[in-house]
């Protein structure tokens, strides 16, 4: 049985407490749970508690406390409700990891937007394609924020929030998620420069390509090695030298980012994916 000491009552349905047994900062959600509750009051396990968000790490607790101190109660409540939207939509989301990151991001994004300061999301297209489920959840979150906070979060913010969600559910750090997006973005720029045409980011070829890059990065980070038939590899290099040279450039760029060795087989498979773009472009040109 948990005993909680109330730190802050946001409204009748949301309170921030300390779990006396485990010494964790927690957010409690429940209908009427905050009614007539004051700071310092004790609260035992109750049927009124519908949801508990735990902050286990000391640094997360300190960070969250600092955010709570500077946040408007209405904004904080709306962020907690956004967390509820996310965890109801996807049960694989690790809420203890996401709570602080989401609060921090939305709180400062809200302040920026109120001051008409906007940040461009350079990886919006990649995020939408790679993490489509997280992106759709983020759309619901932004709609909720816009409605309750009477503000207009831009589409770029949907992408940022989707990254936080994807990072939590896929057990990846936000740095890893952003690195993957950056590598994909640079790969597309290399292809567009050398192929001399714009890549259709709505095409099946694009979706397959970014998935290939995503799993290629994971293989490289894990040190996994794939094999390819030498005859097949030599044939691709001979028939599609431009695609092969583009693949070499992309692999060199990836090596700089990941500091790993990349074997010939990966070059061959990447060449194959790049060739799919050229074939589709030829079809579109001849229509």
From Swiss-Prot:
Homodimer. Mediates positive regulation of the ptsG/glcA and glcB genes by functioning as an antiterminator factor of transcription via its interaction with the RNA-antiterminator (RAT) sequence located upstream of the ptsG/glcA gene. Keywords: Activator, Phosphoprotein, Repeat, RNA-binding, Transcription, Transcription regulation. Residues 67-175, 176-284 form the PRD domain. Belongs to the transcriptional antiterminator BglG family. GlcT subfamily. PROSITE patterns: PRD_1, PRD_2. GO terms for biological process: positive regulation of DNA-templated transcription. Gene3D superfamilies: 1.20.58.1950, 1.20.890.100, CAT RNA-binding domain, PRD domain. InterPro entries: BglG_antiterminators, CAT_RNA-bd_dom, CAT_RNA-bd_dom_sf, PRD, PRD_sf, Transcrpt_antitermin_CS. NCBIfam families: antiterm_GlcT. The keyword Amino-acid biosynthesis does not apply. It comes from Staphylococcus carnosus (strain TM300). This is GlcA/glcB genes antiterminator. PANTHER family: CRYPTIC BETA-GLUCOSIDE BGL OPERON ANTITERMINATOR, PROTEIN GLCT. It comes from the Bacteria.
């Amino acid at each position: 049985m948990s005993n909680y000491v109330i730190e802050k009552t946001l409204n009748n349905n949301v309170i921030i407490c300390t779990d006396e047994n485990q010494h964790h900062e927690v957010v409690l959600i429940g209908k009427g749970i905050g009614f007539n509750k004051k700071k310092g009051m004790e609260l035992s396990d109750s049927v009124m508690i519908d949801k508990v968000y735990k902050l286990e790490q000391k640094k997360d607790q300190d960070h969250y406390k600092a955010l709570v101190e500077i946040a408007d109660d209405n904004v904080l409540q709306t962020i907690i409700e956004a967390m509820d939207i996310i965890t109801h939509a996807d049960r694989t989301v690790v809420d203890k990891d996401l709570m602080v990151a989401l609060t921090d991001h939305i709180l400062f994004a809200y302040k920026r937007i109120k001051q008409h300061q906007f940040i461009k999301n350079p990886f919006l297209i990649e995020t939408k394609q790679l993490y489509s489920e997280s992106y759709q959840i983020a759309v619901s979150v932004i709609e909720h924020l816009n409605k309750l906070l009477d503000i207009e979060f831009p589409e770029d913010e949907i992408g940022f929030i989707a990254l936080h969600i994807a990072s939590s559910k896929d057990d990846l750090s936000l740095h890893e998620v952003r690195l993957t997006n950056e590598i994909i973005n640079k790969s597309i720029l290399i292809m567009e420069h050398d192929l001399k045409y714009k890549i259709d980011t709505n095409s099946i070829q694009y979706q397959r390509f970014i998935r290939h890059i995503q799993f290629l990065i994971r293989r490289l980070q894990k040190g996994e090695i794939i094999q390819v038939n030498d005859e097949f590899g030599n044939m691709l290099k001979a028939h599609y030298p431009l695609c092969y040279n583009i693949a070499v450039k992309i692999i060199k760029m990836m090596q700089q980012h990941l500091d790993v060795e990349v074997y010939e087989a990966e070059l061959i498979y990447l060449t194959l994916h790049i060739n799919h773009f050229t074939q589709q472009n030829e079809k579109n040109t001849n229509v």
